[in-house]
């Protein structure tokens, strides 16, 4: 109903019409009492309250249309006003019905637009920046407490970072292994794809030709990127943080190589069908840019910012190092004393419950710091250096009232890869059937990869994260779904996240210290997968 119609219906209310008539009669006679003025004021306020929801609804609809049109227009242009070749390719494929035989519908692909990260926008508000200042003040107090306690215990200032030095030990091995991983990812996938693309249209058996090259690419993904970093990590007995660097880079490069091949195969197939003389291959520079760009979705071109703000880059890296020292002090002041004291009494339900609840605070702080250091500071630093325009690496996950929304907004970079290359491709492959199976596959893959990273980095298999993610996380995804909008559900999401991170920190830390205090002389494979916490009895 429009505002005009709404106003026209005001005459259907006899009480309001009578009040208006009495007021006008009194006004004409030149006599207006205070009582009549108050009645008129209440009448106007009531009408305004009735019109307010309708007015806001119409304004909201117009605003949504305006923003949608603006995004659609800006998506087709980069900052310099030049049309992005990827978008034009997508439009051509959308019009070409033959592309349906080659890949999932192209209109479902991710569209990159220039935008700031959400925290950069929020930090412009003084009230939000104050929360940031609170975390800095807390870090200062952690540092002061450590210095004071060390001075009281040792009688001198002890500025040692033994835990950091141990965690990032054997760093030269990390560097040369990373270079080998990077150079192989830069050369081998591009060479295989280029060789396949040039020979596909000329081959008398294109299917067999494609299967051979696909098998070679799979061997590279699993045999080279999948095996070599893991072997180096285990053979050289790297410490935990050094292991995390190599394993996370291993996973990132595998996902990058898959995206590059996945996005470019349809272009080669289209060119072969149309017998086009135009070379559909991207350049080495485009692939090299993609390997460093803070995204897992390949495009020939991305929105670019006009300049690089080197001061902004330095600030982001400074904040990363600040978060690193923050986590160090959390482990030093909150975690280490807790788990070192666990050995003073045998493992029991009481010890476990106390450990979980005492681990909630450090677990939540580590959650916030990990999110801020990597998803905001680290990715924004590389985005700024590469003039990468689309900075939406996360959304407002803290406002989530459902787990499905939390999974979509917590890590947009990884979510996009899983959504387009696992979920959407499975739906396309099975003709949009088995949606639940496709979602289950996404959860299973994510849970397995997370648990693989932790198992390799910690040198033991303790599937706490796998159980929480695969079973409880998936169940909450269906139970606490997008239909839950009330604030109480946001509280429930936060409470479950707090408890979950407390469980993860408690169980994995207990297992770590149990293996330190109860080592085995000749461990078998089963000893690596059997929890030591359940059988270890500390000797004093």
From Swiss-Prot:
Residue numbers carrying Phosphoserine: 2
Coiled-coil parts of chain: none
Cytoplasmic side: 1-128, 197-208, 267-309, 386-433, 481-486
Chain segments annotated as transmembrane: 129-150, 171-196, 209-234, 243-266, 310-342, 360-385, 434-458, 465-480, 487-518
Subcellular location(s) per record: Endoplasmic reticulum membrane
BP GO terms, sorted: cholesterol efflux; cholesterol homeostasis; cholesterol metabolic process; cholesterol storage; macrophage derived foam cell differentiation; positive regulation of amyloid precursor protein biosynthetic process; very-low-density lipoprotein particle assembly
Membrane topology: Multi-pass membrane protein
Function recorded in the entry: Catalyzes the formation of fatty acid-cholesterol esters, which are less soluble in membranes than cholesterol. Plays a role in lipoprotein assembly and dietary cholesterol absorption. Preferentially utilizes oleoyl-CoA ((9Z)-octadecenoyl-CoA) as a substrate: shows a higher activity towards an acyl-CoA substrate with a double bond at the delta-9 position (9Z) than towards saturated acyl-CoA or an unsaturated acyl-CoA with a double bond at the delta-7 (7Z) or delta-11 (11Z) positions.
Family: Belongs to the membrane-bound acyltransferase family. Sterol o-acyltransferase subfamily.
UniProt-recorded name of the protein: Sterol O-acyltransferase 1
Naturally occurring in which organism (per UniProt): Mus musculus (Mouse)
Gene: Soat1
